[in-house]
């Protein structure tokens, strides 16, 4: 079983959904966790309360990952509260499916700023504190492989995350830092529900073509993240790990 005892992790966008599940499972495996949120303070505090009630250690920190100062603040929280940093999970993400004719500069920049620039800025801020054995996990998406219609901007961001993961694995590998992407299929989260994906024809089609015959749950992604964060995955870097129930 993967153990993270003595490790310190930062999880961005961790007030709900996949991020909350990852933060909770990292803590359950023994890590001290910084739970980042951009606006949902109540959600982040709920995650921390659950972690501490189970005997774990966690704190919240507010920050917009697409802002350099905020990215630095997020990382500083780990050092201030726990004295070091071993694991970075770049989970913050926004999405809006939009057909080409409706794409605007605002739609483009909002998604690329959070999903791509945010991944770079948080990792950049973390780098001075990461040493041999550290793990960076970028949360991508199956969309970069299946390229659904009306998702050119969102899919573009996740394709960029895939590419950045490969580049950083080469760049940071000599320092002993592993970098991987964890790419979920459709997962039942608050965001997926509010976007109308859960229960939609698109979701039903996706599940019917998934070899394991079901959609994903946040815990499915969180368990994979714990493994990638652990020393059990010490020889894995530069990989795109598809957590999709076999869908591709």
Name each model feature, range by range.
Residues 141:
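Residue(s) in the substrate-gating loop at a strand-loop-helix junction
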Residues 8, 15-16:
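Conserved glycine-rich cofactor-binding loop
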């Amino acid at each position: 079983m993967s153990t993270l005892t003595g490790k310190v992790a930062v999880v961005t966008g961790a007030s709900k959904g996949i991020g909350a599940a990852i933060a909770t499972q990292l803590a359950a495996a023994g890590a001290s966790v910084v739970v980042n949120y951009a606006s949902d303070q109540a959600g982040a505090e709920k995650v921390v309360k659950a972690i501490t009630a189970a005997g774990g250690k966690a704190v919240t920190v507010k920050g917009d990952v697409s802002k350099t100062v905020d990215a630095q603040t997020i990382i500083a929280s780990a050092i201030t509260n726990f004295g070091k940093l071993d694991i970075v999970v770049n989970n913050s993400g926004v999405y809006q499916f939009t057909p080409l004719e409706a794409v605007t500069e605002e739609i483009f920049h909002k998604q690329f700023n959070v999903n791509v620039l945010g991944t770079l800025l948080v990792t950049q801020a973390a780098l001075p504190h990461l040493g041999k054995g550290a793990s960076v996990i970028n949360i991508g998406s199956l969309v970069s492989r299946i390229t659904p219609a009306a998702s050119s901007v969102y899919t573009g961001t996740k394709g960029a995350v895939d590419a950045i993961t490969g580049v950083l694995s080469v760049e940071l590998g000599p320092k002993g830092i592993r970098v991987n992407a964890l790419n979920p299929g459709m997962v039942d989260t608050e965001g997926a529900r509010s976007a109308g994906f859960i229960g939609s024809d698109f979701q039903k089609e996706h599940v019917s073509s998934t070899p394991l015959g079901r959609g994903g749950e946040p815990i499915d992604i969180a368990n994979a993240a714990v493994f990638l964060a652990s020393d059990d995955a010490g020889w894995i870097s530069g990989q795109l790990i598809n957590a999709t129930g076999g869908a591709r």
